[in-house]
Amino acid sequence: MAKEIKFSDSARNLLFEGVRQLHDAVKVTMGPRGRNVLIQKSYGAPSITKDGVSVAKEIELSCPVANMGAQLVKEVASKTADAAGDGTTTATVLAYSIFKEGLRNITAGANPIEVKRGMDKAAEAIINELKKASKKVGGKEEITQVATISANSDHNIGKLIADAMEKVGKDGVITVEEAKGIEDELDVVEGMQFDRGYLSPYFVTNAEKMTAQLDNAYILLTDKKISSMKDILPLLEKTMKEGKPLLIIAEDIEGEALTTLVVNKLRGVLNIAAVKAPGFGDRRKEMLKDIAILTGGQVISEELGLSLENAEVEFLGKAGRIVIDKDNTTIVDGKGHSDDVKDRVVQIKTQIASTTSDYDKEKLQERLAKLSGGVAVIKVGAASEVEMKEKKDRVDDALSATKAAVEEGIVIGGGAALIRAAQKVHLNLHDDEKVGYEIIMRAIKAPLAQIAINAGYDGGVVVNEVEKHEGHFGFNASNGKYVDMFKEGIIDPLKVERIALQNAVSVSSLLLTTEATVHEIKEEKATPAMPDMGGMGGMGGMGGMM
């Protein structure tokens, strides 16, 4: 297929048009008084959302070059969401502002490479100031505040997340599910999560979230590598008779065995999923034993004189629900005896007390948290399916952002933290590096301005007022007042601000240093010629068909 090439300003201007359109759709969701975006779906009812990344993911433009620009910024929004759980709209607004300012200067003759260097130095300096200004998340109240803001100012969600963290600990596992009714609920169930995802995406049962869920499932645990189907065929036949799903946790599953499992899963013959065993070496054996105790199963190991070919259904663990994504497996409601679990916890605590290695101690504490902490399940209620999906997305975002806050600390929210950090940065740069530095200094005002605009205020006036002051002074867009942001509980996770700025600068630098674009030319399909009508004269005789 023929390709078209566009160069320099022509290419960058089209890329900018794509970024602008994406930005204009996403920016309206920003802040406590951000607006909703209605998205048409290929089937079913349209979805309504105030989540920036959900809007960005839906955008595809007809112009191929503009679409490339939009897709690059869309990727930034997604990466920010994956890493920090929030800040997608901030990253998009920053990327657009940096690209817009940079494009103006490069069109006027600035050197893109020097500009990029100045931008990188400015961003690094601002991030260092953000780190200095951050403070650790203290008690439950601050966790509630962070979660509330990330859930678009929904205090009930904020409280649920804080309660969940209080019950399972800051490092505990928290999952989000749909409730049966319209009320939100919090359940804490015994469970465990480990960092191994499904071995094949064909095991997925929920294509939208790319997760596999098995309810009331058996669990096969082995420290052996499974490469031949005959190793597990007898056991598969026995579990099929029971009519229950099966999760296989093994050192590895490969070749014929994995292919056969996938094919039978796709055909609907087996309800099955497979993951690699967590950990390595001796630690893997211990973690498999932890899972066995939690689920009431037995690790099938040749060291214990057990083989897969002769394994019985009684050796399998059982769990009420198992959820697997590409990175993690969560086992909820394991059917092991509580006394066995308690004994195992005591055993691990004894090992922690006796070990001298910091690394071993850390790994033992991780195992202890997995065994004793359980899993908190937040059940989200709503009156309709559309509302349920929107609310569930908000809870997921709030949960990720809260974990980010616990991890790296918090800064003042409402877009003020970037401005305060920038006020303390004074770099002595020259020529086009200075241009890059000034681009960042102007662009970091954009998030606060957009929050104010969405709330019905003049963005420029609000930014000027905030810049006149120092410390925790900022703008509360919910009521239009200037307040002490920490006292009002208007806070953001440092990780969210940091990653949003880093990603925005990264993609803007790529776009500004782009000198050519290559895309396929859409070929217009020729309209087919009309068929020859010459033989239709005989149709006069059709009168007899009456």
Swiss-Prot record:
PROSITE patterns: CHAPERONINS_CPN60. It comes from the Bacteria. One of its GO terms (biological process) is protein refolding. One of its GO terms (cellular component) is cytoplasm. Its main location: cytoplasm. SUPFAM superfamilies: GroEL apical domain-like, GroEL equatorial domain-like, GroEL-intermediate domain like. Its EC number is 5.6.1.7. It is an enzyme of class 5 (isomerase). ATP binds at T29, M30, G31, P32, K50, D86, G87, T88, T89, T90, G414, D492. Belongs to the chaperonin (HSP60) family. NCBIfam families: GroEL, PRK00013.1, PRK12849.1, PRK12850.1, PRK12851.1. This is Chaperonin GroEL. It comes from Helicobacter pylori (strain P12). The lineage of its organism: Bacteria, Pseudomonadati, Campylobacterota, Epsilonproteobacteria, Campylobacterales.
